[in-house]
Amino acid sequence: MKLAVVLFNLGGPDGPEAVRPFLFNLFRDPAIIGLPAIARYPLAALISTTREKTAQANYAIMGGRSPLLPETEAQARALEAELARRAPDVEARAFIAMRYWRPLAKETARQVAAFAPDEIVLLPLYPQYSTTTTGSSVKDWARAYKGPGKSRTVCCYPNAPGLAEAHARLIRQTWEKAGKPSDIRLLFSAHGLPQKVVDAGDPYEAQVQASAAAVAALLPEFTDWGISYQSRVGPLKWLGPATDDEVRRAGAEGKGLLVSPIAFVSEHVETLVELDHEYAALAKESGVPVYLRAPAPGVAEPFIGTLAEAALGALDRSGAAPFGPWLCPAAHGRCACRNGGTA
């Protein structure tokens, strides 16, 4: 049997000249800006032009390009090795389909079709489902892929045991390496969303809460923990509390902070710049006595094991379903399970 596992992620510019087209692709997505195309495209052009210089400065901190693709390639190779170990009779290959920069779904679709798989598993590198991330990628893939193979989607895995274990290990290692500082708050920081997206039935916030609770349950030494949301932009009300507000609150209370990127499985601009530079500087200004940041799971063995289990476990079904103990409550009407994987 030939198995293609298609890993979805955001993508990132591979050089300064790619920043504007990357931003344009992002903001022309109707899942991000819900306007008709006749209005959305000019607005995307305006936003990408006005934000280009600031974004280029952020990527310059990381060497002028996003590390997301090489990080994802390392995860793909680790997943292939784990699949070969667990299922030696399966010829499994992991492919990468980025949403907003290369390799885009059209390019990856050609590669998958040339591989001619019997089975396809669509596996997002977003543990928590949102219509703005996984939902958008699944729709994009459906438009791009017309090749062979029976397909199904792992829509989410927010509280899968291996994911929680990977985060918990990295948090504990970060704390121990720093000398086990006392009076420290564990802050799970996730990418934010406009509140209206969640109010419309998107399950993302509930799944972030489930992820954080699963990790915290493995870390009894951290009795003080919370959740915050980063990357807020524009005038709309966003999920809260905001990470910058929580940094200021910790400073006012004299608390140290250990920040874990609970919604991210790879290092990229939101971890390496926003958390490591912007919020670290804010913590210093705000009087936070200790500011630590745990790494994203990357190729940590429990996380790669989760991806392998999710892929192999999906082979006996069709459609979209979560991996692990998660099940969306009925209030989340835009979850993937109720909408063919896309919402």
Curated annotation (Swiss-Prot):
One of its GO terms (cellular component) is cytoplasm. Its EC number is 4.98.1.1. InterPro entries: Ferrochelatase, Ferrochelatase_AS, Ferrochelatase_C, Ferrochelatase_N. The keyword Iron applies. It catalyses: heme b + 2 H(+) = protoporphyrin IX + Fe(2+). Catalyzes the ferrous insertion into protoporphyrin IX. Belongs to the ferrochelatase family. This is Ferrochelatase.
